[in-house]
A protein has these predicted regions:
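A generic structural signal for tightly packed, nonpolar segments enriched in small/aliphatic residues
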Residues: 1-162
């Protein structure tokens, strides 16, 4: 939905505002790595379906470690780009940035670029945009809520930090 509120155009993307605040707060401690997971966009679900969370990462080595851990531990994920050129779509005439763009292109990547603005510049960051729901049961995976990407992240963290 679109609604005008105090001269700001707000799109149905309010959850990313809360996540942006959380990422800003997490960055204050200057951690080595931040990983967040959210049911951020329907665009990720459309792009990779219900079985794979979309993965965005600033650093290739972090993305590769998460992809490897996911593959080894039966929790595959799929990397999508943080394509900087799409950041143009977050420009605003009245604010520092928009939280959602007005076209239908690259919705998951643009949402991830929005979040990227709120993570400290020198911090390694990875973001899972996950559907978190299994529409049909599979062996060892019942129908319903599912923490897609969680095992991949946990195993990568254990490998990296012990």
């Amino acid at each position: 939905f679109d609604a005008y509120c105090d001269h700001l155009l707000v799109r149905d993307a309010e959850g990313r505002l809360i996540l942006a605040d959380a990422l800003t707060r997490a960055s204050e401690e200057k951690p080595e790595l931040v990983i967040d997971m959210a049911t951020l966009t329907g665009a990720a679900r459309v792009a990779v379906g219900p079985d794979l969370p979309a993965l965005f990462a600033r650093r290739d080595e972090t993305a590769e470690a998460l992809l490897r851990a996911g593959k080894i531990n039966d929790d595959p994920c799929w990397r999508l780009p943080l394509h900087e050129a799409y950041g143009e779509w977050l420009k605003s005439d009245i604010a520092d940035t928009n939280n959602a763009h007005a076209n239908a292109f690259a919705g998951a990547s643009v949402a991830a670029l929005f979040l990227d603005k709120f993570v400290g510049k020198d911090i390694d960051w990875a973001h899972f945009d996950t559907f978190a729901w299994r529409p049909a049961g599979k062996p060892g995976r019942p129908k319903g809520g599912d923490a897609l990407g969680l095992r991949a992240a946990w195993h990568m963290l254990r490998e990296r930090f012990g």
